């Protein structure tokens, strides 16, 4: 499968793994402290062919994703579930994911809206047991996996749901199927 967009990954091992899954060009951030030069490369790539961000499903990966989203408008996001990106020793990274899971993530990219869009507020997430309660974390993980928006804490979940334009009905439907 050939991908037109550039795929942004964290490092060389991620590039090697992604290129085994799909035919593509990659941009490596080389860590979570993205410099202006790398951001400029990503901006140029976005203008020419588009960009898909595929970072590790962990804190540094989320930080990279957030920095890119803040500085480069219109990038798409591909997420791999944390459990699918773990090796036998528990280390998390795109380089540990099965090729089929990488391909699947790239085939189901999400694009956030450029403008603030708030169809869901915090009270809905509380009512649905996604923020408060002993089962909230598990319910968030299920919802995040079904909607393909990556691992999220309560605050991040609200931002992601609104950024990707999900409605209260979308969230309720995804949770109904659990």
Task: Kindly label every feature range from the protein language model.
Residues 1-10, 15-23:
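Glycine-rich, flexible N-terminal cofactor/catalytic loop recognition
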Residues 2, 20, 24, 32, ...:
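TOPRIM fold recognition
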Residues 29:
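RNase H-like polynucleotidyl transferase catalytic core
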């Amino acid at each position: 499968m050939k991908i037109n967009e550039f795929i942004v990954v964290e490092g060389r091992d991620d590039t090697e793994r992604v290129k085994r899954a799909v035919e593509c060009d990659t941009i490596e951030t080389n860590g979570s402290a993205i410099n202006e030069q790398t951001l400029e490369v990503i901006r140029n790539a976005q203008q020419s062919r588009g960009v898909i961000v595929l970072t590790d499903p962990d804190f540094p990966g989320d930080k990279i994703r957030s920095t890119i989203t803040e500085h480069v408008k219109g990038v798409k996001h591909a997420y791999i579930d944390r459990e699918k990106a773990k090796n036998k020793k528990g280390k998390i990274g795109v380089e540990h994911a099965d090729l089929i899971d990488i391909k699947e993530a790239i085939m189901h990219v999400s694009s956030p809206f450029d403008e603030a869009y708030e169809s869901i507020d915090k009270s809905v997430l509380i009512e649905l047991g996604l923020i408060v309660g002993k089962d909230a974390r598990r319910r968030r993980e299920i919802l995040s996996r079904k909607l393909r928006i990556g691992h999220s804490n309560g605050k991040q979940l609200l931002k992601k749901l609104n950024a990707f334009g999900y409605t209260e009905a979308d969230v309720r439907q995804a949770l109904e199927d659990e």
